[in-house]
From Swiss-Prot:
Residue ranges of coiled coil: 26-96
Superkingdom of the organism of origin: Eukaryota
Function: Tumor-associated antigen.
Protein's recorded name: Putative cTAGE family member 3
Similarity remark: Belongs to the cTAGE family.
InterPro entries: cTAGE_MIA/OTOR
Tissues where this protein is expressed: Expressed in normal tissues including colon, mammary gland, ovary, placenta, stomach and testis, as well as several fetal tissues.
Misc. comment: Tumor-associated antigen found in several cutaneous T-cell lymphoma (CTCL). Expressed in 4 of 11 Mycosis fungoides tissues and in a T-zone lymphoma.
UniProt KW keywords: Coiled coil
Provenance organism: Homo sapiens (Human)
Length: 158
């Protein structure tokens, strides 16, 4: 080969080296940007995991509160039904023989009043009205918890 051939090869190699060096710099810059983006994504994933744990804890708490409220509503409903039945019996007793006190004492001995509800028809009706109001309030709270629970489970749908 001649000297001129070596010069041409050398020029081609230098151009190739410059191109490779330029591409290497671009790739290093791209790698640096990708590493920065990966760090941002890592932080976002960490934050989302924290939110997920918080939402799961809130969900468990909401389910427990909802369960407690439903149990309370069930208990109040049972008591209210018992009181309604007792009010009907009292009404029959009043209209039948007028011996309310004797009938109430008999029921007390039989264990009909487990929670010591008030004595007397009017007091029982007032007690029943209070229980009914409490039941209505608890049902409203239960519905609100259900709505909140659904919002936690399916954000944007409830």
């Amino acid at each position: 080969m001649t000297f001129k051939g070596f010069q041409m090869n050398e020029e081609k190699l230098e151009i190739g080296i410059q191109d490779a060096s330029s591409e290497n710099c671009q790739l290093q810059e791209s790698q640096k940007q990708l590493l920065q983006e990966a760090e941002v994504w890592k932080e976002q994933v960490s934050e989302l995991n924290k939110q997920k744990i918080t939402f799961e804890d809130s969900k468990v708490h909401a389910e427990q509160v909802l369960n407690d409220k439903e149990n309370h509503i069930e208990t109040l409903t049972e008591r209210l039904l018992k009181i309604k039945d007792q009010a009907a019996v009292l009404e029959e007793d009043i209209t039948d023989d007028g011996n309310l006190e004797l009938e109430m004492n008999s029921e007390l001995k039989d264990g009909a009043y487990l929670d010591n509800p008030p004595k007397g028809a009017l007091k029982k009706l007032i007690h029943a009205a209070k229980l009914n109001a409490s039941l209505t309030t608890l049902e409203g709270e239960r519905n609100q918890f259900i709505f909140s629970y659904l919002k936690l489970i399916k954000p944007g749908r409830a």
